[in-house]
Regions:
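Alpha/beta enzyme core
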Residues: 3-11, 15, 27-52, 57-76, ...
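Generic N-terminal amphipathic, Lys/Arg-enriched alpha-helix
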Residues: 4-20, 253-260
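A short N-terminal beta->alpha junction/helix N-cap motif
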Residues: 17-25, 50-54, 261, 265
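Short catalytic-loop micro-motif centered on adjacent basic/acidic residues
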Residues: 19-23, 81-82, 103, 204-207, ...
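A general structural-boundary detector
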Residues: 20, 145-148, 182, 207, ...
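Active-site proximal loops enriched in glycine and acidic residues that flank catalytic Cys/His/Asp
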Residues: 173, 208-210, 232
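Internal helix-turn-beta structural module
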Residues: 242-281
Length: 288
């Protein structure tokens, strides 16, 4: 059964570890992440971008697939199904479709409009027993056409959004989506500490978890980050493993062209990436 992300993140915040949010793109992705979470006894958040939602034919399809897998794979660890970087309309659709959590990305609105829209969605989510994440300060890189430059959030704006009753907050601290450029200056721990001071016990979220050095991840967790988003790293691992399979001519051997065989190495590569991240984040064994 799907659960809201709030309880697992409150526990993570208190226990000084983070829960991984791994974006799903299809059946292989979803299965790989769920099986790894179960094997490692780790709570997990399945993230769905609006683009991936369209690709998988809609949010109802995704809810059906995930709920079916939870039952068929006997998944007993806490699993949240979470809309990633949702528009106002996207959040409403996911609330209807049966997601257990949403993120409203109002970071490109003026703060007054962000506050108004966030307030409405907090009310709708909490009425349905769902959790809601909000964002202040655009995360750099490109996420389904929304381009941000890796701003640092204003701690006072973070407090204004936190006070609306959101369950966890993504604050821009110089992090970006996708691959980090060689001249990236690193995370702004000064901003993170200032945000933490303003929002108190509220779990914080780190987007763009791919390519951030392990020591910076651990420091961010010590400063209140309880949810870390990973997507690009799984995509690269999947693509590299699939390319290797084809370059070695394995798709031409026997029935190597069968999609179940063709996609298996990529699926295993996702599992290995998820395992590595769960170990780094400290969530292994936390669902026991």
């Amino acid at each position: 059964m799907l659960v809201p992300a709030k309880e697992m993140l409150d526990k993570a915040r208190a226990g000084k570890y983070a829960v991984g949010h791994f974006n799903i793109n299809n059946l292989e992705w979803t299965k790989a992440i769920l099986q790894t979470a179960q094997e490692l006894k780790s709570p997990v958040i399945l993230g769905v971008s609006e683009g991936a939602g369209k690709y998988m034919t809609g949010y109802k399809t995704i809810v059906g697939m995930v709920n079916g897998m939870l039952e068929e794979l006997n998944i007993t660890v806490p699993v949240a199904l979470h809309l990633d970087h949702g528009s106002y309309e996207g959040c409403l659709k996911c609330i209807e479709a049966g997601f257990s959590s949403v993120m409203f990305d109002g970071s490109h609105y003026p703060i007054a409009e962000n506050v108004e829209k966030t307030s409405e969605l907090v009310k709708s989510c909490h009425e349905k027993g769902m959790s809601i994440e909000a964002e202040v300060g655009a995360i750099g890189g490109e996420e389904d056409g929304v381009v941000g430059m890796g701003e640092c959030a204003d701690p006072n704006e973070c407090k204004a959004i936190a006070d609306l009753g959101v369950d966890f907050l993504a604050a821009g601290i110089g992090n970006i989506h996708g691959k980090y450029p060689a001249n990236w200056p690193g995370l702004s721990f000064e901003t993170l500490a200032a945000v933490k001071e303003k929002v108190g016990e509220l779990p914080l979220v780190l987007h763009g978890g791919t390519g951030i050095p392990a020591d910076q991840i651990k420091k961010a967790i010590s400063l209140g980050v309880s949810k870390i988003n990973v997507n690009t790293e799984c995509q690269i691992a999947f693509a590299e493993a699939t390319r290797k399979y084809i370059e070695e001519g394995k798709d031409l051997q026997g029935k190597g062209f069968d999609p179940r065989k063709l996609l298996a190495p990529g699926t295993e590569a996702i599992k290995a990436t998820v395992k590595e991240k769960m170990e780094l984040f400290g969530s292994v064994g936390k669902a026991e």
